[in-house]
From Swiss-Prot:
The modification Phosphotyrosine is found at Y900, Y1006. It comes from Mus musculus. This is Ankyrin repeat and sterile alpha motif domain-containing protein 1B. Signal peptide: none annotated. The keyword Repeat applies.
């Protein structure tokens, strides 16, 4: 080694003495130590001494090495001997670049100030980066401060056109960003078309940096060729940044250079994050549209207040309205204050409830009494002309939902608790489904009802199913000029006003949970009402008795109403109905919450959760209402079966200011409404009516539909006629037209409870009502008809309620079903993917992930489909209710998949016992069933199976092919039966079974052992039996070099089962820089050192079971068998034994959430077991890789195993499994591993011993 190399090495290692010695001969002459001529000895020492600026092969000088390694004293010494600070290495880096990159502020100052050679702070490397770029990128704020003080130019851009501010924003260096924008605020306006600091920070999800940039004055809507910062945040799934940008007021409609908006980009990249971001965007767009509507309404309100002239009859109500308006104005101010200060939603609801109820109670009854019998003006009951209705619409402070909800809707927390978006519309034409408001009688009959009106509206809005509603008031063209109110659900009305904003597609977590939280604060009464419609009290206004029809369609509630044909009357009291479905749902939720926790200590296995797949977690369905079949039936039915009084319509009497009212005493009728769309007839809904008689039995509620009854009867396997008199009577009444979609029958017990409650209330109101003679005669006729058919109808409907079998004929096609829920555009999506029959699309068949996979990206539409599916019959699994098909053909015909019969038979699935053990992987790769709907139908029909029960294999096998092409299983060691690991538990019993199967497969009479049909025997004899196979490359061919030629296990072992090993879990370590096996070695050394520090630490080491399959590695607590975590095979990058202790091994996983790598370290019971685990991991990846290739070749890229569900644009990487020998051992130790089952070659057997290290690297 020459002196130059010695100097470089001394500078790198920090050997100050050696540097001093090597450079000491230069001191006197070079720095002018003497004035006379230099002695000859000194000149010779200079000639022989090292060059202080000498470089190595990378271009590093001694000063580079010292600056990079932080040797301050050597830097000073080198500068003292005139080392140059302005020599660049091969990549153009100067010593100041390296010091800044390292973050050593002292060395940076020395290089700048010490001399005699001074660093130039604006020097650039080959990538045009300055030292400020290096320091800013790695967040060295002290170095950045020094460089900025030295007037480093922060506008210099590197070869990627990035400034130091860009790099700091890109990597989230918050302090550096603050320092640079404080020193040079003009940098935020110096942007390129490629990027801006805001775009870079948004792309990587640095929320704090985004906020700092925006607060510093950066334009939130600045654009690049990729669009706005919102495009970047949405594309990379940064939900928090999207929220910040939207709150700042970014324009969500900006388009990128390709003309795409943010929503367009989200549609191109479907994922869970995309759905969340799309929901935020839609909420933002809806809020912006609503705010504009509020401003417009306020402007119209001012104009209307100046020009409107009220009649004398309206003046009393106007006085009261002004009083309420004054109080509500204070309330709205408090709501806005809540919004600004981000108060909790409970505080806001208390404000609404207390303020409104307290102030409305101040309105004295005397004031109402002064009105006499005059017709007063209210927002829902007054007889108004069309012009007056329009004026009233523009009053945002009225007692209706308009003013209150427009102020309340944007409040934080409203959407989370289930408040729908309410938008008021104005329609010039008559609606198809109006809620007709009848002319008002005297208001003094019920002076206290208005007090609860606002809360009733709030309660009603809150308790609807989670959907977006539109409440629209429209002028009525009827002769009595009564106003109309139509409340429609999306998808059911074709008259939506295009001026309203888009309806949010996201659904709140649970309507019943929201109701439970909200009713308590909005309506604090002794008896809380939990009805889905909150007991329709606001129609108890004596002047407003109309018929309500609550239709439940796919979880969304729509109110439609029509006048009922009945004689005039004064009032009828309303029956309260409690929603027991909500209480049941809450009970279900409580049961789930009360589930006992797992017994293992979470702290011991905390490291395993890094990079763990959420597959072990059971997702909690927020819609508890649809959790079980009973809830699925009862909840929606009770929403649609709310008991309401018989509607009475007051006949308008012209030329008479005071209508004459004659009291009658009718029997109160409880109505049960069933809806069924009939495409051949008009959408008539027939209402079955039961008379309430004291002392009579409490029968079931029932309903009939003349248009759809025969169809329903066919569904249930029986066709019968209905008495014509009953149909004619109901048709003549023309009660309502419904846009509802599904027949709903309540369960027997629930219906009887409801009937009992309603009968009690009806009997109490019977004495307070009278009937006119004509009305009496009509109902007497009804009574006779009811008595004649009562028993037959009830017994028949009891059979309907008890019927649980699958319908024998389809109720409707998929297209008709989708049209009924307002989503006909998805018919091709469902049909093309196997969801082609409504009978086989129940909740145990179709899931949200299925809809996402087939291309339904809109979360609101998926939610609507899933809620409608809850109302469809579930598939009947084999064995349910005695259903046991005797053959495969019979079973396939029963689920309408008879076309697959031949595929099942030729692949050996000849009996139902074999079918009950089939797995979805076999359906994809063996039976080639590519339609996900058909696969889900098959699995749902087979029912639930135990996970621990291995599937029975049909007479076919996935063979392991040797390089010679012979289709034989791997040759195992003859001493397999002797290699029993009593401690490790790794004896592979299925190997013996596999050998027997292989022998049978080689026997030409193999198929004679299995009972089969004539068709099967013919196919076996003619050679038509297809034997699908998966070919694994042997280890020595799949890797660069290895002494092993055969894998440890048969591939089916890793596909249908798993290989379980016991080991000790030592812990995990964060890998800052991924360096393959070096990283695993460092982690193993660190974990061993931690365990050796104390015996107490060793006692805490838990024992786990590693369950290895082609999907990945599951971690099972050996104590209680609970699954702790699961690492997918695609996230495992490297596995290796520790060279210092071969019984210790580790592998590296990637945590997808944090994007960090973690190394998990384990200790096996012996060296052999550690080697076997590492080899099994390599084989698991090879199996998964071959399965993925086979699935892709077969055109099933959308149905790959879950471990390979990557984006289609990325090719599947070829695995690099390297099992290499790194240590040669003494031949005397060769016999140690002679009996291992994976040792198959005697020649190779003698080449490996106990001290051999094997590594499996999987990338």
């Amino acid at each position: 080694m020459g002196k130059d190399q010695e100097l470089l090495e001394a500078a790198r290692t920090g050997n100050v003495a050696l540097v001093e010695k090597l450079l000491s001969g230069r001191k006197g002459g070079i720095l002018g130590g003497g004035s006379g001529p230099l002695p000859l000895s000194n000149l010779l020492s200079i000639w022989r001494g090292p060059n202080v600026n000498c470089t190595d092969s990378s271009g590093y000088t001694a000063l580079h090495h010292a600056a990079l390694n932080g040797h301050k004293d050597i830097v000073l010494k080198l500068l003292q001997y005139e080392a140059s600070t302005n020599v660049a290495d091969n990549k153009g880096y100067f010593p100041i670049h390296l010091a800044a990159w390292k973050g050593d502020v002292e060395i940076v100052k020395i290089l700048i100030h010490h001399g005699p050679s001074h660093s130039r702070v604006n020097e650039q490397n080959n990538e045009n980066e300055t030292a400020l770029h290096c320091a800013a990128q790695y967040g060295h704020s002290e170095v950045v401060a020094v460089l900025l003080e030295e007037l480093t130019d922060p506008t210099i851009r590197n070869s990627k056109l990035e400034t130091p501010l860009d790099l700091a924003a890109l990597y989230g260096r918050l302090r550096v960003v603050k320092m640079i924008i404080s020193a040079h605020p003009n940098l935020m306006s110096c942007n390129t078309r490629k990027h801006t600091p805001l775009h870079l920070a948004a792309r990587n999800g640095h929320k704090a940096v985004v906020q700092v940039l925006l607060e510093a004055g950066m334009d939130v809507s600045c654009q690049t060729e990729k669009g706005s910062a919102l495009h970047e945040a949405a594309l990379f799934g940064k939900v928090d940044v999207v929220r910040v940008l939207l709150e700042t007021g970014i324009d969500a409609n900006i388009k990128d250079s390709l003309g795409r908006t943010v929503l367009d980009i989200l549609k191109e990249h479907p994922s869970q994050k995309s759905l969340q971001i799309a929901t935020l965007l839609q909420d933002y767009l809806e809020g912006a549209g609503r705010s504009a509507a509020v401003l417009e309404e306020h402007a119209q309100e001012d104009t209307a207040q100046e020009t409107h002239l009220s009649s004398p009859a309206e003046s009393p109500q106007k006085t009261k309205s002004e009083t309420v308006t004054g109080e509500l104005s204070k309330l709205l101010d408090e709501i806005k204050l809540c919004q600004e200060k981000d108060y909790s939603f409970e505080d806001l609801c208390h404000t609404i409830s207390d303020h409104y109820l307290d102030n409305l109670s101040k309105i004295s009854e005397e004031e109402l009494g002064k009105n006499g019998s005059q017709s007063v003006r209210t927002s829902s009951t007054i007889n108004l002309s069309p012009g007056e209705v329009e004026d009233e619409e523009e009053d945002p402070n009225s007692c209706g939902p308009t003013g209150l909800w427009e102020a309340l809707t944007p409040c934080n927390g409203c959407r989370n608790l289930g408040f729908p978006m309410l938008a008021q519309e104005s329609y010039p034409k008559k609606r198809n489904f109006p809620m007709e408001m009848e002319p008002s009688a005297s208001l003094d009959t019920f002076p206290s009802e208005n007090e609860n009106f606002l809360c009733e509206l709030v309660d009603t809005a809150v308790t609807k199913k989670p959907c977006s509603l539109e409440i629209a008031r429209a002028p009525s063209p009827r002769t009595d000029n009564a106003s109309e109110v139509a409340i429609t659900a999306p998808g059911t009305s074709h008259h939506r006003n295009s001026s309203t904003g888009p309806t949010p597609d996201c659904s709140p977590p649970s309507p019943d949970t929201a109701l439970k939280n909200i009713v308590k604060v909005i309506r604090p009464q002794p008896k809380q009402r939990t009805s889905i419609v909150s007991s329709l009290d606001f129609q108890r206004m004596n002047h407003n008795q109309e018929y309500f029809e609550i239709s439940t369609s796919t979880g969304c509630t729509s109110f439609t109403s029509s006048p009922a044909a009945s004689p005039p009357t004064s009032s009828v009291e309303t029956t309260e109905v409690k929603n027991e479905g909500a209480e049941h749902a809450d009970d279900l939720s409580q049961q789930e919450d009360d589930e006992p926790p797992k017994e293992y200590d979470a702290g011991q296995f905390a490291g395993l959760l890094h990079g763990s797949s959420p597959a072990c977690e059971s997702p909690e369905n927020p819609f508890h209402l649809y959790g079980k079949r009973n809830t699925c039936e009862d909840g929606p039915d009770e929403a649609s079966l709310a008991n309401s009084p018989l509607p009475f319509k007051q006949t308008p009497i012209e030329n008479n200011p005071e209508p004459s009212v004659k009291k009658v005493k009718p029997k109160v009728v409880s109505r049960t409404i069933f809806h069924k769309r009939n495409h051949q007839l008009e959408n008539h809904t027939i209402v079955g009516t039961r008379m309430s008689r004291s002392g009579s039995r409490n029968g079931d509620q029932w309903g009939v539909n003349p248009g759809g009854f025969v169809e329903r009867a066919c569904t249930l396997g029986r066709i019968r006629s209905l008495p014509k008199a009953l149909i004619d009577m109901h048709l003549s009444k023309n009660v309502s037209k419904s846009d509802s979609d599904l027949i709903a029958y309540p369960s027997k017990d629930k219906a009887r409870v409801n009937w009992s409650k309603s009968s009690t209330a009806e009997r109490s109101s019977k004495d307070n009502s009278e009937r006119t003679p004509s009305f009496t005669s009509e109902w007497e006729e009804i009574d006779k008809i009811m008595n004649s058919i009562d028993v037959g109808i009830n017994s028949e409907l009891e059979g309907m309620n008890g019927e649980t079998t699958r319908p024998r004929c389809p109720v409707q096609t998929v297209g008709q079903w989708l049209e009924s829920i307002g989503l006909p555009q998805y018919e091709n999506h469902l049909m093309a993917n196997g969801f082609d029959s409504v009978q086989f699309m129940g909740s145990n068949v179709m899931e949200d992930q299925d809809l996402l996979e087939i291309g339904i990206l809109n979360s609101g539409h998926r939610q609507r489909i899933l809620q409608a599916i809850q109302l469809l019959p579930k598939m009947r699994p084999i064995g349910h209710d005695g259903y046991h098909p005797t053959s495969v053909a019979e079973w396939l015909d029963s689920i309408e998949l008879g076309d697959y019969t031949k595929a099942f038979l030729i692949n050996g699935y000849t009996s139902m016992d074999l079918l009950k053990k089939i797995w979805e992987l076999e359906l994809i790769n063996v039976l080639k069933i590519s339609l996900i709907g058909h696969r889900k139908r098959i699995l749902a029909s087979l029912g639930d199976r135990l996970h621990d029960d291995p599937p029975q294999k049909p007479p076919r096998s996935i063979t392991l092919r040797e390089p010679s092409g012979n289709h034989t299983p791997p040759q195992l060691s003859p001493s397999l039966s002797q290699s029993t690991y009593t401690t490790g538990g790794s004896l592979d019993v299925p190997h013996i079974i596999m050998q027997g199967d292989a022998r049978r497969r080689r026997n030409e009479n193999y198929f004679d052992d299995i009972p089969r049909s004539k068709l099967e025997r013919q196919m076996a004899q003619t050679g038509d039996w297809g034997e699908p196979s998966i070919t694994l490359r042997p280890p020595n061919e799949a890797t660069a070099s290895t002494p092993v030629q055969y894998w440890q296990h048969h591939p089916e072992k890793l596909i249908f089962q798993s290989c379980d090993y016991k080991a000790f879990y030592l812990g995990s370590m964060l890998i800052k820089e991924l360096r393959g096996t070096e990283s695993t070695q460092d982690a193993c050394a660190k974990m061993r050192a931690n365990c050796r520090k104390s015996t107490e630490q060793m006692k805490k080491v838990p024992t786990i079971i590693l369950s290895v399959s082609y999907k990945g590695v599951k971690f099972i607590d050996a104590a209680n068998k609970n699954i702790i975590a699961e690492h997918e095979i695609r996230n495992i990058s490297c596995a290796a034994q520790d060279p210092e202790d071969l019984s210790t091994f580790a592998y590296i996983t990637k945590d997808l959430k944090s994007n960090h790598h973690y190394c998990h370290v384990f200790t096996a019971f012996d060296v052999n077991l550690a080697y076997e685990i590492i080899l099994t991991l390599g084989q698991a990846f090879e199996v998964a890789y071959q399965l993925a290739l086979q699935a892709r070749k077969g055109g099933h890229s959308s149905t790959l195993p879950e471990s390979f569900e990557n984006k289609p644009s990325k090719p599947i990487p070829k695995p690099r499994v390297s099992i290499r020998k790194s240590v040669q051992i003494d031949p005397s130790e060769q016999k140690t591993l002679a009996n291992l089952p994976w040792i198959v070659e005697p020649g190779q057997e003698a080449k490996r011993g106990i001290n051999t290290k094997y590594e499996t690297t999987i990338f």
